[in-house]
Amino acid sequence: MEPLNASLLRTLEGFESIFRDNYTPLFRYVNSIINDEDLAKDVLSDLFLNLWQQKDKLQINELKPYLFRSAKNGALKALSSRYQTSELPDDAFNIAENTYNPFEKFVAKQSIKIVEDLINSLPLHRKEMIELRLLGLKNAEIAQVLDITEKKVEYNMREAIEQLSHAIHNSNLDKATIAGGLMLINIIFTVI
């Protein structure tokens, strides 16, 4: 089988294209695992160096899941059995500055903070799936990155939606914040 993007991997320009297209989401993902920007950069340097050095030997069927799986393995290796929780990427839920009036912006930021806190309270595997979804991966790609079945991803996403929705509904928050939080959850699981 001919490796996917084999022609891209054979030229420096193609490799640069792969690097440019994937570095930022990979950096966010690795940094969310290890919570250390310098170490995340080192992990990605090693990943791309290895990709370039092994370009003639690799048999990659789908590039994006391969890169995320390699990044995850590199991050876990860099942690060397040290467990550390992390926050979602700072820009996971960007709020455009000119989109909202001050009250709407306040409610949106409050809703985002609540949803982030709720996501961080999920079991680690569900949190990781949501982070990958926020980085733009589809269920099939998430399954490949985490080396699980797509059905397991779908099940855990449904369970995460139920957990998050239940937690928001049972909170002592005002209706606007609840509505904003539920809307964000819906966006995470449908649009992205």
Residue ranges with predicted function:
Residues 1-25, 190-192:
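N-terminal module of bacterial RNA polymerase sigma factors
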Residues 6, 161-192:
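C-terminal edge and immediately downstream basic/flexible tail or linker adjoining helix-turn-helix-like DNA-binding
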Residues 129-130:
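A short pre-motif secondary-structure segment
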